[in-house]
Amino acid sequence: MNSSILAKLEQLSIRLEEVSIMLSDPEVVSNVKKFTKLSIEYAQLTPVNQQFQTYLSHLKNLEDAQLILFEDDMEIKTMAKEEILNTKKILSQLDLKLKKSILPKDPNDSRNIIIEIRAGTGGDEASIFSGDLFKIYSRYSEKQKWTIEIISSSIGEHGGFKEIIARISGINVYSKLKFESGAHRVQRVPTTESQGRIHTSACTVAIMPEVENIEEINININDVRIDTFRASGAGGQHVNKTDSAVRITHLPTGTVVECQDGRSQHKNKAQAMSVLASRILDAQQQEQQEQQSSTRKELIGSGDRSQRIRTYNYPQGRITDHRINLTLYKLTEIMEGNLSAIIKPLIIEQQTNQLTELNNT
């Protein structure tokens, strides 16, 4: 382990002591918000520090065993050699764990998300595929015990969605689904195809961290135009006689959000504002990502939603993630919501690249 990493771990140990002292301060205890924040930090730092202290202890044992090699007693030297081998194995394992523990954390990982799926090239087949993608995320969310709520949707003429926007809430949603942003391509024979020809269609997926408190995004009310209109069902059929649907336009950016799936104008307005805030936050963070490491841009995308990230090939039962050249012949399983087979390799790839960068510092 290089000196810069050791220095970072020593700083974490010092910080843990500081937090421990602050948590016993009566003023901090009486401040619920500050006490909660520090308690979470303490809980995060404690296991890292415990591993670090264990690492230092084994490092001292290794140094002691290496000194014994200079002894004349062959039996003691043999025991020392065995001790050195075992200790090096333990240190190697602890080294990797500690490095992973200090990798840069994405501040959005614990957030809920706003997911937007839009049909792209391919007409009706693209709309049907967008519906299939929504089913994948719905089933995966169910397996993760997350909650999914549709905010807005536009039904395709032959099924699926021209566009669907939803909120997914639960534990660490963004950390697992953030890799889904980009263009998803499907190759299959449409049900309407009489010649049995394979068609290629595409959809775009946008994953945005949800803004828990809209006030954290500075939206000037004078920069927002709010219009109301009657909500419509499939085929343009009015589903109510009041102007419950809401369209919000953010004038500086030209961002437009519509919401009509809620039962009231108040709920639709709140949901539309939530989506707007998430889009603005996402745009700000996409800008920041341009200045970050190539690893992050490569895996999560540089903001270009048209970047093709994945192909679903039905005739071959194959799914390919182009970012890490991963090909799996588990299409049916993944379409049933078993996304972990793709998400885990993406996380491992990101961590591997981060570890490489860390080792080079």
From Swiss-Prot:
PTM per Swiss-Prot/TrEMBL: Methylated by PrmC. Methylation increases the termination efficiency of RF1.
Family annotation (Gene3D superfamilies): 3.30.160.20, 3.30.70.1660, 6.10.140.1950
Keywords: Cytoplasm, Methylation, Protein biosynthesis
Residues that bear N5-methylglutamine: Q237
InterPro entries in the record: PCRF, Pep_chain_release_fac_I, Pep_chain_release_fac_I_sf, Prokaryotic/Mito_RF, RF-1
PROSITE patterns on file: RF_PROK_I
GO molecular function: translation release factor activity, codon specific
Pfam families xref list: PCRF, RF-1
One GO cellular component term noted in the UniProt record for this chain: cytoplasm
Disordered as annotated region, ranges: 283-307
Subcellular location: Cytoplasm
Residue stretches spanning the membrane: none
Family named by the database record: Belongs to the prokaryotic/mitochondrial release factor family.
PANTHER family named among the record's database cross-references: LD18447P (PTHR43804:SF7)
Summary of the function given for this chain in its UniProt record: Peptide chain release factor 1 directs the termination of translation in response to the peptide chain termination codons UAG and UAA.
Name this polypeptide is given: Peptide chain release factor 1
Native source organism of the sequence: Vesicomyosocius okutanii subsp. Calyptogena okutanii (strain HA)
Organism lineage: Bacteria, Pseudomonadati, Pseudomonadota, Gammaproteobacteria, Candidatus Pseudothioglobaceae
